[in-house]
């Protein structure tokens, strides 16, 4: 009789074997994902800490035969304390983002997945240069990941004097990649990131030596998110156990509820404990599994909790959304809205939406859809996303005045939450959650109504212009009558007065109507009136 052999593997080994789970499914996707992870970290190190971001992205081909590319991303953020660097880049699932506040990343995986992918196809380590704010030194690291142990391997660590008071982080990775297939997605990612962060500046140099610079348009940075306590609706049995273990010493369960959760005060705590049949003074360490299960069940069914706090969220804001849309698309109309906070499964979320219409936007069979989650542009897996579903399937755009078969329309939706329901660890599409889907539709309906008002008023103005332009052709007759009235019977004076009045009336009318039609002007000037 044969026996099965059982073994365990580390998180690093798991993601090395399954890179597609983190978005590293092929050489093109790996290059895009690496740029994305590094840029997200750079933005979290800057705008979250009220620093105007200056971000450099440089991609170079260093080994044409093996198709090895060098990716470098540098920011002017808060920097990383040197004792944190090894684990931050060399230990999978080690992160500063396991807190209840909105962050661009959420799994403690991103850059480590890029390092793992890098190690699979070439020998160079990840290179990190960093200096925390007010640090007197700049630190240099060369690192790899010990896949079996899920621990960093420090190959080099040095430091130099920080003579210019620089602060920030520069990360360099080498990886097997496909620039030609990744190029469009990377350009799209950088552009869409800039649309919602016009307070940042981006310098991007690609392997073909093309350089793009997106300049900073404003000094206004969105309010950063704050860390909050968990909401009772979002708890489970294991979370309660973890919170109890984390406490330095046992405390009465009543105090535990009041001090460790939002939306629970003295009265609410007493009600919960009464419903769960638990004594107020029982110590947390004395709770049995059955009692914890009972407590969680009561908390989930309790109806009187206040909604989760939105302090943990950071919206883009209507002004910045409109500024970004106008700067990239140059539309004739742009509008945005930020909805009020809502919650799903105990997690707060806010939906923002923006619309740009007309102007320089190219007509297309479907709206151009810009999807964002926690200020991250979502580029891949578009049609599996709930945002795409609402924009293309649930919105009847003709109801809002858009009658073109190929409308010049851009629709932007941003979801921010302490827990975005991504479909996978690759973080490229948002799952269908009823509460979120409803808010997306309501947000789009809000901005679409503003677009409808604009289109309706524009059409009325155009109709009025057409009627008034018809009346313009009477200017010569009116000028003739006024000339006869003003100067009497002197033909020479009548002719001069007629020409002068005709030009003045024509100029006033054209300016008033904002008509720029040279052919119409000539037609009016050459109009033959009855002999003066």
Per-segment meaning from a language model:
Residues 79-87, 114:
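Short helix N-cap motif at coil->helix boundaries in the Bergerat
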Residues 148-154, 177-189, 193-199, 209-242, ...:
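Charged regulatory segments coupled to nucleotide-binding catalytic modules in large multidomain enzymes
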Residues 2, 69-70, 95-239, 282-295, ...:
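GHKL-type ATPase core
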Residues 28-57, 110-117:
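Conserved ATP-binding N-box helix of the HATPase_c
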Residues 60-71:
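Short beta-strand-loop-beta element adjacent to the nucleotide/active-site pocket used for signaling
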Residues 75:
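Acidic ATP/Mg2+-coordinating residue in the GHKL
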Residues 254-276:
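Helix-hairpin-helix
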Residues 14-36:
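Conserved short strand/loop->alpha-helix "switch" segment adjacent to the catalytic nucleotide/phosphoryl-transfer site
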